[in-house]
């Protein structure tokens, strides 16, 4: 069987031979393997999301909501050092998040002291207009909470939605033309646009996850970099 990026198996030092190169992804993966706590799928989801967002947004504090291990927040700082700090927020922060963070700091000492992990509700962090709000697979209506918080602060935002809840999210009457999940994401994009945002709609590779639609937004006419 091939090496599937969609696998939920943890990456460990046994996988180091799969990342023998000198690319940034190789270096990140090597650190993740040393930590021996992160599902393979989470590495690829975070990497593909972060690099697409960094092509558009620089600067600002990173706020990673429903962050899990907080890899996305840390990748944003690894990819571009113009963000001074990052906050990774989740109701429950996995104990192994600290293990992963130490492995990344060992490789990139400049991360030390710049990542804050908060085990708290997603609305516990005050959002600033200069922030970049991000979330990978915030389940169901949590994606809508992330968008609402970004819109209220006029902050930049990027979400990779999953687990679409047809009963609680808005498909906008579009389900006769497209599947419910796509209809809900279309309405999310339109909500950003209606709030005065410029939007970018992208996808990450489908072999990582079928829930691969990436929605990115910044206030139209505002600064993309901050």
For each feature predicted by the language model, list its residue ranges:
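Class I S-adenosyl-L-methionine
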Residues: 1-226
């Amino acid at each position: 069987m091939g090496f599937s990026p969609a696998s939920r198996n943890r990456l460990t030092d046994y996988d180091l031979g799969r990342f023998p190169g000198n690319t940034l992804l190789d270096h990140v993966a090597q650190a993740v393997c040393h930590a021996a706590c992160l599902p393979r799928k989470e590495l690829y989801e975070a990497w593909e999301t972060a690099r697409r967002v960094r092509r558009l947004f620089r600067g600002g504090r990173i706020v990673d909501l429903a962050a899990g291990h907080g890899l996305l927040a840390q990748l944003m700082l690894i990819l571009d050092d113009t963000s001074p700090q990052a906050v990774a927020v989740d109701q429950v922060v996995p104990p192994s998040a600290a293990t992963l963070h130490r492995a990344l700091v060992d490789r990139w000492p400049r991360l030390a002291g710049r990542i804050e992990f908060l085990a708290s509700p997603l609305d516990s962090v005050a959002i600033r207009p200069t922030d970049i709000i991000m979330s990978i697979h915030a389940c169901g209506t949590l994606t809508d909470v992330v968008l609402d918080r970004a819109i209220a602060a006029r902050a930049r935002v990027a979400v990779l939605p999953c687990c679409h809840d047809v009963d609680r999210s808005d498909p906008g009457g579009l389900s006769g033309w497209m599947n419910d999940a796509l209809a809900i994401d279309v309405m999310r994009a339109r909500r950003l646009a209606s709030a005065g945002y410029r939007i970018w709609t992208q996808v990450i590779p489908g072999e990582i996850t079928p829930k691969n639609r990436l929605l990115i937004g910044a206030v139209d006419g505002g600064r993309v970099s901050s």
